[in-house]
Amino acid sequence: MTISILGAGAWGTAIAISLSDKQDVILWTRNKTTFESINRTRESDKLLGCRISDSVSVKLAIGEVVNASTIIIAVPTQSLRQVCQQLHDCGLKKDIAIILACKGIERSTLKLPSEIVNEVLPNNQVAIFSGPSFAIEVAKKLPYSMVLACQNSALGSKLISELQQENIKLYFSRDIIGVQICAALKNVFAIACGIILSKKLGCNAHAALTTNSINEVKALYLAKTGNANIDTLLGPACLGDLVMTCTSLNSRNLSFGFKIGSSNDSFDVQQILSEGKSVTEGFSTAQSAFNLAEKLKIKMPICEAVYRLLYESVSIEDTISALVN
């Protein structure tokens, strides 16, 4: 059995390292420099010190990944549609399941990752792999828990058996939409928390902001589905991921917010983004979430405050006022 992982960023590479003890793995990258570097050093510059096993075969041509038993996609959400189209054009077989390990909302369509796949690859079943998991800790094989969300219970059981490792606790869910909403929004909330932390506004403000974040998840969740599953909200995919991402500077999104808050309105968003080794999904998701809230006619004040700071040049002082009030 072979699993193909599309995307050799920190997260995709960490998954490849984690799974390579149990089975053969193909790791696909569209970046020639990354391809050559990993093949030469058996290490990623995004996960220094974590060796990539020889059982991980790194490929540059996407046509070499389509014959795996399962495909995991770990590319940025804004690139997902293009990658799915490439898989379609390569003749991906309909019996190959796709596991999505990307978090966000497509800016141009306001669609979740599973909705994108359903449009481009309608014959392939989709599952979501999400939860509190820093890539570096996964690559070091430290313990963690995740949710595997899939509407087909039999397929879900099969995929869990493929992904199961000694250091991971996997929970099954049928709530594909809820899990994705949580996964996307928590990155925006982490940016907000980074700003609050940078200004040393205290644990009380930080805790209040994190708590209010769950209310915004619930608001979008209800608007999209008409129902908010309490098990999803209180499980690893929502509460667990939110707590981790909104409290640790190991979070790219929280670190991004912290740098902005420390800059006293003199920040250059693109420069801060370019300083990171990996994609800061919350930047794109802030815009998508704001536009989706407008479309659905719901209030999401934290997402709105982050959006207006990043895209409309609202001051940090006014942003903080909106966040704490």
Predicted regions, residues:
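Hydrophobic anchor at the start of a short beta-strand
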Residues: 3, 24-25, 124-126, 170
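Rossmann-like NAD(P)(H) cofactor-binding subdomain of soluble oxidoreductases
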Residues: 51-143, 159-161
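Internal alpha-helical scaffold of NAD(P)-dependent oxidoreductase catalytic cores
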Residues: 79, 90, 116-124, 143-232
